Amino acid sequence: MSYANYRYMKARAKRWRPENLDGIQTSDEHLINLFAKILSKHVPEIGKFDPNKDVESYISKLDQHFTEYPSLFPNEHTKRQYTLNHLEELEQQFAERMFSENGSLTWQELLRQTGKVQGSNKGDRLTKTFEGFRNQLDKVQFIRKLMSKANVDDFHTRLFILWMLPYSLRKLKERNYWKSEISEIYDFLEDKRTASYGKTHKRFQLQNKNLGKESLSKKNNTTNSRNLRKTNVSRIEYSSNKFLNHTRKRYEMVLQAELPDFKCSIPCLIDTGAQANIITEETVRAHKLPTRPWSKSVIYGGVYPNKINRKTIKLNISLNGISIKTEFLVVKKFSHPAAISFTTLYDNNIEISSSKHTLSQMNKVSNIVKEPELPDIYKEFKDITAETNTEKLPKPIKGLEFEVELTQENYRLPIRNYPLPPGKMQAMNDEINQGLKSGIIRESKAINACPVMFVPKKEGTLRMVVDYKPLNKYVKPNIYPLPLIEQLLAKIQGSTIFTKLDLKSAYHLIRVRKGDEHKLAFRCPRGVFEYLVMPYGISTAPAHFQYFINTILGEAKESHVVCYMDDILIHSKSESEHVKHVKDVLQKLKNANLIINQAKCEFHQSQVKFIGYHISEKGFTPCQENIDKVLQWKQPKNRKELRQFLGSVNYLRKFIPKTSQLTHPLNNLLKKDVRWKWTPTQTQAIENIKQCLVSPPVLRHFDFSKKILLETDASDVAVGAVLSQKHDDDKYYPVGYYSAKMSKAQLNYSVSDKEMLAIIKSLKHWRHYLESTIEPFKILTDHRNLIGRITNESEPENKRLARWQLFLQDFNFEINYRPGSANHIADALSRIVDETEPIPKDSEDNSINFVNQISITDDFKNQVVTEYTNDTKLLNLLNNEDKRVEENIQLKDGLLINSKDQILLPNDTQLTRTIIKKYHEEGKLIHPGIELLTNIILRRFTWKGIRKQIQEYVQNCHTCQINKSRNHKPYGPLQPIPPSERPWESLSMDFITALPESSGYNALFVVVDRFSKMAILVPCTKSITAEQTARMFDQRVIAYFGNPKEIIADNDHIFTSQTWKDFAHKYNFVMKFSLPYRPQTDGQTERTNQTVEKLLRCVCSTHPNTWVDHISLVQQSYNNAIHSATQMTPFEIVHRYSPALSPLELPSFSDKTDENSQETIQVFQTVKEHLNTNNIKMKKYFDMKIQEIEEFQPGDLVMVKRTKTGFLHKSNKLAPSFAGPFYVLQKSGPNNYELDLPDSIKHMFSSTFHVSHLEKYRHNSELNYATIDESDIGTILHILEHKNREQVLYLNVKYISNLNPSTIMSGWTTLATALQADKAIVNDYIKNNNLNI
């Protein structure tokens, strides 16, 4: 081995440090210890086998070895493989042939039938030992762990690894693959015995002293090498350059390289002596290959010296059917159009066949990747790196545990498992085993569990996740906001040095609150398990993690840290300050037992990649992969692919000047009336867009300390603006660009109004920057008259201008004039507005501007973005530009907006309820109905189930329920009272009042037999008492017809008095009461009263004061008329004959007048049948005018009609239509309900009401908790209790009703309403209950 080879090997070995390497699973600890002892020369010897000795003794030793290390030899296969590796080559071939013929042979039988086993030297045995277990361990992890354990010199260990990599950790059939490895290892293998390492090391040390700074390049082995002479690269970078190679023998051949993305092929030189891939400028131009600047310019030596300052993006190329992805340096001249270096071939495991002049790709073998080291200054925090921590159950942190709050406890999830193929079954078992071992999951007995599914990782492996979608429907949302990207970037301004930290298994660092674990149960073929840590997939996890990390970081996040989920960026203005900041953050993470993923961390960088941007001191640019996504886009074949392309472009829109002008030819193809036809115009448009992205502009961080300039302009159809800031070189650099189309109404504005609209829209767009400036910022406009309109203090010309001037008062600015020729940027933006941006609706000039009821403030945007994280579909749209383009959805200021200019919101959230409340209760329309409210809200917002949620809210609105009348058909079918068996058993009574006074009487007592329909009419007064009524009933009814069995009457105080109760008890009849103001309950009496009144009008209409004189005639006329229900006269049914009604007529007597005679029984039977038939007809007719009965349950809240029942009715047209609500106590009949009335009115009204007088009170505590109309609250007598709903305090109060001052009511009202009614008693209650208002 040459000295140069040794120096190179040593440099490579030094870069591989054990402390930078990942750990390995503890289940393989025995194997680690075994090989650590091998390297430490403490190998447990099985013994060199003598072929002349007994085979059984060697089998015994092997069996003992297998028993000592059970985890290394878990099955027959591993033991048999180990045995094969300890046979000589011929015996090994013989044994393998035997096993192929008989796969059931054991390792003992293989040894016995082979006949002899020959040991070998230590190096060979070590090699075979590694080979025997190469498939049991991940090679990279195994080597890293091994290096950290070996008690040998680090240098020797690393050289040993260099030897083992190509020779021992390959599959058997590729044992000779090491011959094609890099020549340093090939040369080193000439002296591969570990015993000679030390001698070689000492020899090279002596050589090194003598040679001093001798060049690494030797003339005899660099003749054909090409040198890279870097112009701006340090010596350290130069020594570690991956293109350096001083010993490799050069081989060249030319192949045709296919570029499928660009549909072309180019001759390509395969040059093992080349140090980098190169391509000529002519080739780049000919095939329109996208390039970008290369910051590390180099001078490329050789025959064609070139200065290189550009390179291509990563291109997909195909060589002999082998697909690779690589980039090329662009040179002016070269012998071939392109060249591919040995490094590219090596990185892609491509081997050159010099005899066949072809390439072949070997199976990929993972490489040991250099990972970032933890700087020495932070070594004290080494114990929080993933390399020193395996995943384990974290300790709970009080107040930061993950809580799973459900909207209901009695829920059931669908029981189903997703089918899993064998490959995924193995991945599932690995995940379950690892989770059980680390303690983050455990077996569960939960009755509800969600299924598991698998998603691919970036590296191609599978990740098991739980599909918590069914559970998320019942999880209460977490409204903690996720930070806005723009606000995070704004905090970085002024920083020059950055450190990025990434948390390892971030979600699994948070414990689940004790008692909530069963809610996170998941189901798989192995059983049911539950998480003890916060899992992925639960809807509230992102918000809780953001709250968790913000709490851990504390005040640091306000000064020197920005974090988005598990990505943490520490930024400082100086190196010394940065060390303090990093230590502060690491200490906070250490205190919380959090672990960082060192492989993804970057320390003390001048620029970093963070949340999709490359961030530096100067500003931020988009990440290269997002740019490459556009640069590599093929020509769209249809509208769907074109929308996807424009979606990717729109994501980078803020970095592409004149976006709309560039996309205009493409947008034309998306119009409905345009036929799809791809022309060179569209092709050129895509090329122009790609060219703009080759070197995107750097947008500066906004700095509140720097001067601000806002340039605006308006064209006929659009407005535009650019926001800039003045930097130390006295130049203005852009912070952002803005352009927007005008609506149809805005197109009709005057020129001055359009120019002012440009200012208003720009200020709204950058409000978070411009509203809080201390010094005034400048606004430049090219419309001179606009300055006077804004600075003029006279009365505004119209309401729109008045609103604008009021809006401008929130900003501190001065406006100046600049001609349009100088204001070129804003002028261009106003004329080149992005046609993909939605046009706002025509609502600017409406007299009632419903759309602007909700102001789109920053707080509102934050709340919307937070809600997005809890909705899987909207979160997918937020993160997937292609999906947005496909569904014609825009992303504007963090909000998703559809083609109708509606903001998309998650369904049924606190935010949507707030929006409904704003428009329904606080809008310019007074409590609009369902349809009107839906149409108003749909002008600006939409979400799934919007109509259903609005309907629920309006139906639950207390104000609407008690004040709006119902137009539906009355409730409750007619329930006729069954007829009695004979006359005068069942009677009905009532009074006809409001009659003119006649002979001292002003009322009429009416008694009707419900069987015969006979009526008894007795004149009386309105002031008749219960005692007088009883005497009158005794003399005029009982004396002639005997005692009745039951009497039906209304709830008049006479019939409910104690006197009447005693009278009923004396004559042994039962009183039944009809419902108040429900005439259908006792329809017979009502009908009789109507007939009597009609007859009285006929006989005394000219002399109404003589009605008493005609009562006997009216009674006789009524009782001798054939009744429609019985088809007979009442008199005939009762007396069994028909009296003479005129002097010419004789009475008709029956031969059998005995009531027990057969004829009388037959008559009664016929009457009863007629009554039943009449009841059926009457019910059928009545029920045609009603709707299905509303069934109430005890405990339901109902309202009582005021106007129809007179219940709590105040003679006031503005009084509420309903009283209540009241609780239902019980059902007292088919259609009647008894209500729980307040004690103060129980004596005034019956507590039983027919269902037709009731309306269900819809009460959803999440929507509206108040049950009292605030206008009805008079004096508050007492406060019973309080509740908090949605941060609003509600009080349950007893009060005197304003509508009925004699009535004491109770119900729920808001604190604000209660304070207006009685401030003193409310304040006393707050003080006594220690309420924090």
Curated annotation (Swiss-Prot):
InterPro entries, A to Z: Aspartic_peptidase_AS, DNA/RNA_pol_sf, Integrase_cat-core, Integrase_H2C2, Peptidase_aspartic_dom_sf, Retrovirus_Pol_polyprotein, Rev_trsase/Diguanyl_cyclase, RNaseH-like_sf
Bias type Polar residues, positions: 218-229
Protein name: Transposon Tf2-9 polyprotein
Domain named Integrase catalytic: residues: 979-1138
Active site, UniProt feature: D271 (for protease activity)
Other remarks on this protein: Retrotransposons are mobile genetic entities that are able to replicate via an RNA intermediate and a reverse transcription step. In contrast to retroviruses, retrotransposons are non-infectious, lack an envelope and remain intracellular. Tf2 retrotransposons belong to the gypsy-like elements (metaviridae).
Organism of this sequence: Schizosaccharomyces pombe (strain 972 / ATCC 24843) (Fission yeast)
Residue ranges of every copy of the Peptidase A2 domain listed in the record: 266-342
GO molecular function: aspartic-type endopeptidase activity; DNA binding; DNA-directed DNA polymerase activity; endonuclease activity; metal ion binding; RNA binding; RNA-directed DNA polymerase activity
Top-level taxon in the UniProt lineage: Eukaryota
Residue ranges of every copy of the Reverse transcriptase domain listed in the record: 436-615
PANTHER family registered for this protein in UniProt: PROTEIN CBG26694, PROTEIN NYNRIN-LIKE
Binding of Mg(2+) 2, residues: D990, D1050
UniProt keywords, alphabetically: Aspartyl protease, DNA integration, DNA recombination, DNA-binding, DNA-directed DNA polymerase, Endonuclease, Hydrolase, Magnesium, Metal-binding, Multifunctional enzyme, Nuclease, Nucleotidyltransferase, Protease, RNA-binding, RNA-directed DNA polymerase, Transferase, Transposable element
Binding site for Mg(2+) 1: D502, D566, D567
